[in-house]
Structures are given as C-alpha cells and as structure tokens.
Amino acid sequence: MSHFQLEEMLRAGVHFGHLARRWCPKMKPYIFMEKNGVHIIDLQKTLVLADDALNALDAIAQTGREIMFVGTKKQAKQIIAAEATRAGMPFVCERWLGGMLTNFSTIRQSIRRMNSIERMETDGTFDMITKKERLMLAREREKLMRILGGIATMTRLPAALFIVDIKKEHIAIKEARSLGIPIFAMVDTNCDPEQVDYVIPANDDAIRSIQLMVKAVADTVVNARAMKVEQEVLAEMDAPEVDAAEDAAQSAE
C-alpha cells in the first residue's frame, strides 16, 4: 500500500518543477512534461520512489539508529524542526556548519560547551560572576543553541540524512557522501539526482509540498520506533515462558 495518494500530491503542488531553462538534464527520467515553460514532475514515479525511500527509512529507524533531518531554506526550516522534534530525530534548520559530520568530534565539543553554559545558569555559577560575563555567556549559548540545538543530543553520526533542497545543502551532501552515509532527499528538476541514494522527485520550494514529504518521513520514523518498542516488550513477555519450557525439559531429562 502506498504512503501517498496522487490527489494529495497534486493539491500540495508536488508536481511543479522549475523553469525548463533551469533544469538539470539528469532529471529527465522524472519529468512528465513541460507546460508554460515549467517542468512538470511525473507523480507516478514520485509515488513509487517515495514509497521505496520510506520503506528504507522504516528499516533504518527500526534498528534504533538516528536519521538527521536537514533543511535550512526559509520554507523548510520550521517544518524540519517541528517534524524532526516530533519524531525524536536530530535536525539542522538554521545553518550547516562545515564539518558537522566529517569533524563531528569538534562539533561535540561545541555542544558540550553549550550544555556547560546551560548548567551554569542553574547551578548558581551565574550568581558568582559579573553581569557582563553573564551577558556574554548567554549570548554565546544562544548562538550555539540556534545552530546546534537540533543535534544537541546526538552522540554519534546519523545512519542516514533526509534533505530538503540538495542544491542548497550541497555541503551536507558532500560530507555525507564522503562518509558513506545514505542520503534521502526531495529532488527538484534543477538538481542532480545522482548525488542522492534515494531520490524523491518533488517540488522542494512549495511549503505544502515540503510539509507533505517531511511529515511522511517523520510518521514513518515514529511508527517504526513504536513497532520496535512493541517487539521488545513482546520479546520480554515471551522470555519467561521460554525459560520455563527449558527448565521443564531439563527436569524431564
């Protein structure tokens, strides 16, 4: 069963690509037609490829590994933050810092610094320093929080990236590819699909299109995590029965 309906994709404007003169020829297999100088994405292919991507993300999420949501453009940032938070996943919605993946140990130091300042605010340290020092530390924490807040709880590299607008997030793409981290992405008609492992041909500019796709990814993660918990609970419930059966078998011997 598909995760999407063709009608909802049409309503969200998923099919609207960029001006034909701005296209990437490598997107030709995913384009249905040109209308009034604008490329129209083949939604039948989007349906199939989106399902493939979501099934793969489901498998990753069930392992307990994290999927990083990335989208820093104006139309995407609030959606990325809200849906990633709902799914309990790390996210980047303000600015991608160079080395966020390839130099993760240094990024972790910045996160520890941010958390250290936060502790100072609650453990009484702020009461022992000057007003100027408090202000400087508060500003430092605010800046770090704005950029790193979405990955504050991330302790290791993500198992995959889900990206909105691969042209804008080219640094994230480059870092993930260098580390062999799978990339799932909405890919518009002006982008190179060969940069991505799981292509979802879609309008990456319209808010409703972004919302539809990002929500679907978050829903997939939430459901996969819930299934994992359910399976673990069932396994724990079955364990005593297995132990009892083994004990009975040993006694019979």
Swiss-Prot record:
GO terms for biological process: translation. One of its GO terms (molecular function) is structural constituent of ribosome. PROSITE patterns: RIBOSOMAL_S2_1, RIBOSOMAL_S2_2. The keyword Ribosomal protein applies. One of its GO terms (cellular component) is cytosolic small ribosomal subunit. PANTHER family: 30S RIBOSOMAL PROTEIN S2 PROKARYOTIC AND ORGANELLAR, SMALL RIBOSOMAL SUBUNIT PROTEIN US2M. This is Small ribosomal subunit protein uS2. It comes from Chlorobium luteolum (strain DSM 273 / BCRC 81028 / 2530) (Pelodictyon luteolum). The lineage of its organism: Bacteria, Pseudomonadati, Chlorobiota, Chlorobiia, Chlorobiales. The gene is rpsB.
